[in-house]
């Protein structure tokens, strides 16, 4: 794929990620949605995905660089699927079976190890079990899961194409 074509794809992923981040931010601030810690992690992953793709657009990487960027997109997509999937799972568990509350993420990161804070975050709270907003009968974590699944599939496909093209380039004398 040409450099211009790869920049276009990275630009597209950046724009979609930026739009999703903007929508999530506006829903929380303008819509008055309370954020649980898992939703904060999902937003952080969205921002990281956007940042990686913006760097790829600015750099205009070669063949190896494109493979690295698609690999990073794949990793972020996988982390997003795990996080959003856990959030969707928590929404299907009665809130009485979950922790009542947790301190905010910044407090947990100051007082606990990174691993302990992540573990507590993934345990979830009753806040994470609440469905406060839906669009087309899908909650925000379900939309997030759909977005990350699409990113995972797209990034996996692009990485596979990149690696397959690299193998062909090496095989040719």
Curated annotation (Swiss-Prot):
SUPFAM superfamilies: DsbB-like (SSF158442)
Periplasmic side: 27-44, 86-142
Top-rank taxon, per record: Bacteria
Primary localization class, coarse: membrane
Flavoprotein recorded as keyword: no
Annotated TM spans: 10-26, 45-61, 68-85, 143-161
The entry's keywords: Cell inner membrane, Cell membrane, Chaperone, Disulfide bond, Electron transport, Membrane, Oxidoreductase, Redox-active center, Transmembrane, Transmembrane helix, Transport
Gene3D superfamilies: DsbB-like
UniProt similarity note: Belongs to the DsbB family.
The protein's name: Disulfide bond formation protein B 2
Gene: dsbB2
């Amino acid at each position: 794929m040409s450099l211009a074509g790869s920049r276009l794809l990275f630009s597209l992923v950046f724009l979609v990620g930026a739009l999703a981040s903007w929508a999530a931010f506006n829903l929380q601030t303008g819509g008055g949605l309370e954020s649980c810690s898992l939703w904060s992690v999902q937003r952080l992953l969205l921002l990281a995905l956007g940042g990686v793709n913006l760097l790829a657009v600015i750099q205009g990487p070669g063949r190896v660089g494109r493979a690295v960027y698609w690999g990073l997109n794949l990793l972020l997509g996988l982390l997003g699927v795990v996080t959003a999937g856990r959030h969707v799972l928590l929404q299907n568990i009665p809130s009485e079976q979950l922790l009542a509350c947790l301190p905010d993420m910044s407090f947990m990161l100051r007082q606990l190890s990174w691993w302990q804070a992540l573990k507590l975050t993934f345990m979830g709270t009753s806040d994470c079990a609440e469905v406060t907003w839906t669009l087309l009968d899908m909650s925000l974590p379900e939309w997030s899961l759909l977005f990350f699944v699409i990113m995972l599939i797209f990034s996996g496909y692009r990485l596979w194409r990149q690696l397959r093209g690299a193998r062909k380039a090496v095989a040719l004398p």
